Amino acid sequence: MIQRFITCLAALTLVFAVVAPAHSVQSNPFQQDNQFLSVDQAFDFDSEVNDSKVTVSWVVAPEYYLYQHRFKVVPENALAAEPELPQGESHNDEFFGESIVYRNYVEWSFTLNPEFSGDTITVQYQGCADAGLCYPPTEKQIKLSSTSETAPATAPPNTDSSLFGIGEQHLIITLLLFFALGIGLAFTPCVFPMYPILSGVVLGNRERNWKNTLWLSFIYVQGMAITYSLLGLVVASAGMQYQAYFQHPVVLIVLAVLFALFALSMFGAYTLQLPISWQSKLQSFSGQQSGGNIVGVFIIGAISGLVASPCTTAPLSGALLFIAQSGDMVSGVAILYALSLGMGVPLILFGLSGGKLLPKAGAWMNVVKQFFGWLLLAVTLFLIERLIPTSISMWLWIFYFILAAVSLAVSISQPLRITTKVITIVLLAAAATTGSYWQVNKAQLEQKSHGLFTVVSNVSDIQQQVAESDRWVMLDLYADWCVACKEFEQYTFSDEQVQAQFQEFKLIQADVTRNNAQDVEILSRYKVLGLPTILFFDPEGNERPEYRVTGYMNAEDFKKHLEKIVSE
């Protein structure tokens, strides 16, 4: 029964992993009645000049954030050295991957070059709202003659709604995921067969009753958990200093290669573990501890966390890289603590039941190990897809899902009965088909929606298109740095019912990614707060502000919005 459950869970996990991202965006639409702040209200800028030191700060409104990689000082020769960016928190979205952002309040200091003779410098920054609006790149000039006219930057009251960088809700999901992964690691062939021996070592000569077993097993797990948690703390604290570098293409490639190597280890291509000499010394010290007492059992658990088996070394290394990239010390400790608790659950169950609640060791454990290998390989693809065209990443994912399904199906064909074989293979085939379809459909929708619009590049082009049309004109303002703009293209404009309504409109689009003089003129002329923004012009050529769309709108709501305009 356990074997069937594990293999079916593996297949369903593959299906969920590819269906959930597409569903979540469409099932959680942002309402259009959001009242967005102006850029200066969302990001209250302040500066102070003290001799050669300049300090700039932003008070960031709740549910808004600034991008770390958008911070820049112009001209660059005004700086004495490359300024160190303040620590931020990790932010992930479907289109741009992992970024470092600032919420609530951020302060940035840098030193001026003594040889710089200019009177002013310019600070550039850019941010977005959680509700789906991104502001154009913003510039603020700072006078360097004596002291800045602005007031000194002071920290506001602490309004942080989350203790953890990845957010409380996301942290809970992450902890549950790593707890489940810990349970999965416990069923790998290097770990699971050791539980009978380990249970005997933990109990020592103590009387074997459920109270002693539960208590000592818990102490052992705590020793292992604290060791892992300390590893997470060390790695996260180191990652905090280098968060910005984790977004560099070279670093992403290196990380992708590392995860691929970890995956090969789980496939049995080579053995990844501590040097034998280190293991011998740790095991020798562990052997000197006596089971059956709290201190001895705790030390044995702590040492077992260091002597990682070949089956756990690769996933543990992958978890450490994940924590290093987040740079969040608190969540780093919590994640590895959850992972180790998951690994300890089977030990506690084994001790309490004498092994009756757990399956017998067998070939099915290799399936679990291989499943972890495919999960690590998926991380490799997630990392490199940020650096390659969508068309290429689409085919890589298709190849991945098919190969993973075939590989797992072949692996489970031996240890399972014929009924379970058929069920599991069907589930794996469904996972591969679903994943492949989603990737192909995603690429096709992006191309399809993007080709609907006539491209305009300045105010004159817009005015000409509006003047020549005898229908309603819809002007879509787009930029590559706008996450919600991409959501519009992929999930809203690609909808068949929306496209049916498009027949009543002339569609034009202005790409303001570069934020050059022409782009700024467009945004200024039409008083655009941020992106995405969609303007509507009636057949007489007048812009109708009451129909303007600011921020993301899902397909159903946008279709109704178009119907309302046409029915006028």
From Swiss-Prot:
Pfam families: DsbD_N, DsbD_TM, Thioredoxin_7
SUPFAM superfamilies per record: Thiol:disulfide interchange protein DsbD, N-terminal domain (DsbD-alpha), Thioredoxin-like
Disulfide bonds: 128-134, 190-311, 482-485
Compartmental location: Cell inner membrane
Keyword flag Membrane: yes
Gene Ontology terms: cellular component: plasma membrane
Catalytic activity, EC: 1.8.1.8
InterPro entries in alphabetical order: Cyt_c_assmbl_TM_dom, DsbD_gamma, DsbDN, DsbDN_sf, Thiol_diS_interchange_DbsD, Thioredoxin-like_sf, Thioredoxin_CS, Thioredoxin_domain
Gene Ontology BP annotations: cell redox homeostasis; cytochrome complex assembly
Keywords for the protein's UniProt record, in alphabetical order: Cell inner membrane, Cell membrane, Cytochrome c-type biogenesis, Disulfide bond, Electron transport, Membrane, NAD, Oxidoreductase, Redox-active center, Signal, Transmembrane, Transmembrane helix, Transport
Signal peptide: 1-22
Domain of life: Bacteria
General function of this protein: Required to facilitate the formation of correct disulfide bonds in some periplasmic proteins and for the assembly of the periplasmic c-type cytochromes. Acts by transferring electrons from cytoplasmic thioredoxin to the periplasm. This transfer involves a cascade of disulfide bond formation and reduction steps.
Protein name in UniProt: Thiol:disulfide interchange protein DsbD
Gene symbol of the encoding locus: dsbD
